A protein has these predicted regions:
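Residue-level preference for hydrophobic side chains embedded in well-ordered alpha helices
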Residues: 45, 49, 53, 57, ...
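Short, charged helix-capping/linker segments at alpha-helix termini
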Residues: 35-44, 54-73
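A short pre-motif secondary-structure segment
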Residues: 157-161
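Intrinsic, short, N-terminal disordered tails of RNA polymerase sigma-factor systems
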Residues: 1-32, 36, 40, 44, ...
Length: 209
């Protein structure tokens, strides 16, 4: 099993396969046009950023099955408050900030609901619904399962920078914390994920020895 995580991504766009700068310029333009009442621009804005929002909330909530509902909630919130968006940050950074709040609110609602059975525990749900064989991981190791082992703040920082390709500055704005805090959380997340991969490899070798 390959126990090496993807190389860290910093603030340089060259480290990200997609041209994030160009994409952000276009999507931000659509958001501003939508704010002015352009319905076609609003549709284009949603289509352009839907995938990033779904990926973000799926990893952050550790519940892939809830991702579409959380993404829909995010876009509804964004469209209701679009008149406040002035383009000082990219539309994607602004939208992911809203997505984070949607996930946090969902956690709070879930915590307020009484558990009806042991199967309501989110970890059990994660175990049943984990995707396997995700790109970048061999032998069926699921990234979602690994991320579920991380504390919320480290998982958030890792997803924003390493999976969605945000710079540390953009991730800090989305997470509402200093850049240095994001860097520290990403470093600790990578250390923890590497340890989990190595532990899994050791257990596999022990079973087959």
């Amino acid at each position: 099993m390959n126990t090496t995580l993807p190389a860290p991504r910093g603030s340089q766009c060259a480290a990200v396969p997609r041209d994030r700068t160009a994409e952000d310029t276009v999507s931000t333009g659509w958001a501003l046009a939508a704010r002015a009442g352009d319905h076609e621009a609003a549709d284009a804005f949603v289509r352009a950023l839907h995938r990033d929002v779904v990926r973000y909330v799926a990893h952050l909530s550790a519940d892939p099955q809830a991702a579409e509902d959380l993404a829909q909630d995010t876009f509804l919130r964004a469209l209701r408050t679009l008149h406040r968006f002035e383009g000082r940050s990219s539309a994607r950074t602004w939208l992911l900030t809203i997505a984070r709040r949607a996930v946090v609110d969902d956690f709070r609602r879930a915590a307020a609901r009484p558990l009806l059975a042991d199967t309501d525990d989110w970890r059990a749900t994660v175990e049943r619904s984990q995707p396997t064989g995700l790109p970048g991981f061999e032998d069926g190791v699921a990234l979602q399962e690994l991320l579920a082992t991380l504390p919320y703040d480290r998982r958030q920082a890792f997803v924003l920078t390493q999976l969605l390709g945000l710079s540390y500055a953009e991730a800090a704005r989305a997470a509402g914390c200093p850049v240095g805090t994001v860097r520290s959380r990403v470093a600790r997340a990578r250390t923890a994920l590497t340890a989990e991969l190595e532990r899994g490899e050791a257990e596999t070798l022990a079973r087959t020895a």
